[in-house]
Amino acid sequence: MNQEVMNLFNPQAPAQTFDSIRISIASPEKILSWSYGEIKKPETINYRTFKPERDGLFCARIFGPIKDYECLCGKYKRMKYKGIICEKCGVEVTLSRVRRERMGHIELAAPVAHIWFLKSLPSRIGTLLDMTLKDIERVLYFENYIVTEPGLTSLKEHQLLSEEEYMIAVDEFGEDQFTALIGAEAIYELLASMELEKIAADLRVDLAETTSDLKQKKLMKRLKIVENFLESGNRPEWMIMKIVPVIPPDLRPLVPLDGGRFATSDLNDLYRRVINRNNRLKRLIELRAPGIIIRNEKRMLQEAVDALFDNGRRGRVITGANKRPLKSLSDMLKGKQGRFRQNLLGKRVDYSGRSVIVTGPELKLHQCGLPKKMALELFKPFIYARLDAKGYSSTVKQAKKLVEKERPEVWDILDEVIREHPVLLNRAPTLHRLGIQAFEPTLIEGKAIQLHPLVCTAFNADFDGDQMAVHVPLSLEAQLEARVLMMSTNNILHPANGAPIIVPSQDMVLGLYYLSIVADKEPGEGMMFADMGELQHALENKVVTLHTKIKGRFKTVDAEGKPVSKIYDTTPGRMITGELLPKNVNVPFDICNQEMTKKNISKMIDHVYRHCGQKETVIFCDRIMQLGFAHACRAGISFGKDDMVIPDTKAKIVADTEALTTEYEQQYNDGLITQGEKYNKVVDAWGKATDKITEEMMARLKAVEFDPVTGRQKQMNSVYMMSHSGARGSVNQMRQLGGMRGLMAKPSGEIIETPIISNFKEGLTVNEYFNSTHGARKGLADTALKTANSGYLTRRLVDVAQDAIISEVDCGAEIGLTMQPIVDAGQIVASIGQRVLGRTALDPILHPTTGEVIVEAGRMIEEKDVEIIEKAAIQSIRIRSALTCETRNGVCAKCYGRDLARGTPVNQGEAVGVIAAQSIGEPGTQLTMRTFHLGGTAQVVDSSYLEASYEGTVKLRNRNVVRNSDGNLVVMGRNMAVLILDNTGKERAVHRVTYGSRLFVDEADTVKRGQRIAEWDPYTRPIMTEVEGYVEFEDLVDGLSVSESADESTGITKRVVIDWRSTPRGSDLKPAMVIKDKAGKILKLSKGGDARFMLSVESILSVEPGAHVKAGDVIARLPMESAKTKDITGGLPRVAELFEARRPKDHAVIAEIDGTVRFGRDYKNKRRIIIEPNDDTIEPVEYLIPKGKPFHLQDGDVIEKGEYILDGNPAPHDILAIKGVEALASYLVNEIQEVYRLQGVLINDKHIEVIVRQMLQKVEITESGDTGYIPGDHVDRIELEEINERLIEEGKKPGSGNPVLLGITKASLQTPSFISAASFQETTRVLTEAAVAGKMDTLQGLKENVIVGRLIPAGTGGMTNQIRRIATARDELIIDERRKSSGSTEANAMLVDMTNNAAE
């Protein structure tokens, strides 16, 4: 009884729990079973009574009552009649909420095709029937008949007949000899009569027999769809609809506006259209109207249903009264405003407020200031409850009155309510998880939220009018999570790189830096101080200043915690900072006995965090913030115009450079250099001049000056202090103020040759000002584009990585990646220690000299290990990586390594995919959109020579050198490398040297660090001869294949190979140079081929015919100009290009095997290159290369697998196919890191690896074996492994496949979860595909769970699920035990066992 009463008052049925969602095509019976009645009239509501019309689109009899528990005519009212159906109006007395759940239907007079299955490419109906979409449409829209049953006539099945042809056929064969139908009925018949099993069997036979690729592809597509239908239990004829479902009326509401008009959902218009046409068609059929009229009506019905499902997909868009296209059912789901992204993935919340933020320096790190007014509003329900509990009010109404009057007791209660109740602060745009953090509110007067200065970096907030939103976590669980996980004190480290993010900035840095300055000849120099008390005393009496050099005693503790002290040479300012350090044996005074620049402060905080833990760090940060502010204020640092110092040498440097540019101009006029070279040189010269002036200026600013009167050191230049400490401003900005503004870019990204010589202190001339506006405007335009692009990149990354969750502790993988330091132009940009910190070692790491184990296999590499590794100079380390992790549905903790935001091993349930996506996407807005190029000079300056980065002995790998006529060693090999070995013979560095480089060292020479090893001309690529002899030209015909180009301004000629294929006469020329001996015989090369050198277009000839050349002499050169002026994709577009795995425009051609290059017969205008393998068991590989491309290999060159045949950016797919997963991973990681490194952004490699792992989830089946897949199918890697294991156990033939690389968009759309894919992009296509295949979504990822409204399977949500599973298992055990109740002890033992597991 009791239960029933409860049910009366809580009519909500408990939510159903479910584990998966399936989508399939609805059969007519299914649609009928959903429906509560047929809709026969197009009417909506009666405009006078506002009551819904009977049998109309809002009919109360079908859909339910309008008011709770009240029938339409008003005969039955109130709860007591629940469930009764009124005999007068036929409405069931129940909740009006059922109008959101009950569906209706429309019985169609003629079948219509469902547009999704017809038009969503590839057309499912078309593929099944093996007809083209055009033909099917002709049948559906009543243009042609289709033969469904040819009988004994000469007609073929599926043959289309026009009206006349049909009439002729009827005359010829008689009407009952064959069947030809028209319209959707015809397609319905064809689909209904399909025997899918038979078709599938036939297709398999055909597949085995056919050889042509195109046919195979077509058959495979068809077979796939047939199998989908067979597996899912869908019937093909269900794609033709006889009944249209009508969605519940409250989901397509009709809202009365004032003035008697109505606002309605577009769906009602679309449904009305369908009902009108359907009713008209029924009437026409009853009246036996002429066929042509009925046919026309049927066509219109088909169009109406098409528009309802997907308006605008076919034919004209149906528009409403205001000429705006009507929103169909598909549009309701699609895009940013669709159901998925607008309502399911992001919902609006109540209990939130927003206001402007101001700084709150007196707050503690875990606090924020909340205006009283705001708090009162946000915590209302809590206040009402507390007022009631304390007896101040007996009803909610009274409580409301008290709060409105703002009585004093309300404020007291507000204080109680707010205590220990965290609130969430959020600043838009929330680019990473630190954009929402929890704080404890403290009540303040005023209307602005106070924010702690140290969390500004995380929120990217400043106080120039930014606003923030406040959210109140209501439930106990929410408060708990906010406090334990989201509290600002728990977010000290940056999830992207593990560096502290709670770092003082600006004023605080300036104050701390000022404290740490050392000055000479200050009063009291050399005094000794025993403790801080004495020092304070001396400071207050001005015996010493903050910057005096003194000796001071610093007290700390040893390992046992006993106090120890030591005397340091330091300054009073540094002693004050040192006082704040936590007392710990690992935190010495040295870390603050140095210049406190922002970097050093960050290192200090990091050090304290690693050794003293979180609590100490938070207290320490708060203290140094206070100290920084106090001393920035006391120091009184400010700057005036005179602080910008213009170097005295500026005029001279400018004059010298102007002289240089005039000289280049002259050289150009004399024809010694080309226009492009002149441009490069001029831009280069000005670039150098700017740098020189900057150096001079900085030297002036840095210089220490003494006051001649007092002899004391003058105060440091304040601008220099600000910039050097990292508080504000950069060298670049100072250069513009006090040096020279330098070169400017045009909007196109080119550099303007004439620089801006003035600086802002001197003022710009009108011309200079005009030139500088270019760059400024481009910057603004770029910023707007950048934000949108960066946001879209983040969205794609999150989508692809959302289901990468830590799901187990150790997957036991035996494979991993090899980490090496990244060297760029001889500089180490990322040391090996930085790269392996916080990763798990795959093999034991051994000391190279002693052989002792530094890190055991399977242990995480910590800071202390990194020190040893760096000292031992280990060059490569094998580590575990998420890329090679073998966990199914997720990643394991061992492969991932350290959780960067906490500095501890990663927890189970951490959503590492989303964190990776945020870490890569968040700095996106800092990347450039297009890179400015200093005319290619910036790259050139540093890439024309090679210096030794270590001391050691030289070894040449693949040595192939000759001495040319100047007596220099010249590199002749294409894959030669210079190795530098240390005294133990270990490789310290490997440098590739390009063909044609001049070598300054030879085998076994010793080199010093910084010694030049080799140099080359960065602007051209040489073609050199290996033999001595006389030059002769072949096919170098003037005007056809060679042109004498005279530089128009100089008159000097040079001979250039031109595109000889452009004229018909030159099509079969092969321009080349040969080297002959005195007798005129062609010489042989060392490899056995002729000394013939093929020339490509744009080669410049360096010798005349008949000239005598020695080995190593350049006979022609290919200018690299083209590669240089071309804008290399940089910044954001480059990152997107890599993640989308696009093939670059002119991508490199990579050799697939080791072997020798041979030239084959040319094919049209392509060159055929054959690589003959060294190993005879492999087939030779052929490549076709466009003839005009600069091509540097010669006949007979030896080439290694993975080497470039044609230069360019390699396509990632090629790297994967040729060199394997590890090479691909290192390529992608390095390339992406390069872009971020240029911007000074630190991102840990593991984030990029997680994303790349998601891109490599699929394999393409090559051998299907007994797997049941078709070659060419894309299958999950781990799924295939599992199937193969099962097949091997059963003794069947396993399948095999090659890994495929998918771009992030493609990979997101191919996730096993259709819900996730549909909410990402191409909603219609994804849902159509899923419905045909009857896909099941097992709700593994985060997105699917958010959409269906469950806890996400990560973090606490994942834990809850696990606990629930354990509980269910235990319950079942107990139930079993009760059943047996014979006192069996096994179940008890199991129970105890399970409890223990759960506890663990």
From Swiss-Prot:
| Residues binding Zn(2+) 1 | C71, C73, C86, C89
Question: What are the protein's UniProt keywords?
Answer: DNA-directed RNA polymerase, Magnesium, Metal-binding, Nucleotidyltransferase, Transcription, Transferase, Zinc
What is the disulfide pattern of this chain? none
Specify the signal sequence span: none
Task: State the oligomer form and interacting partners.
Answer: The RNAP catalytic core consists of 2 alpha, 1 beta, 1 beta' and 1 omega subunit. When a sigma factor is associated with the core the holoenzyme is formed, which can initiate transcription.
Record-stated family: Belongs to the RNA polymerase beta' chain family.
The protein's name is: DNA-directed RNA polymerase subunit beta'
Organism source for this protein?
Brucella anthropi (strain ATCC 49188 / DSM 6882 / CCUG 24695 / JCM 21032 / LMG 3331 / NBRC 15819 / NCTC 12168 / Alc 37)
Which lineage do the record's taxonomy fields give for this organism? Bacteria, Pseudomonadati, Pseudomonadota, Alphaproteobacteria, Hyphomicrobiales
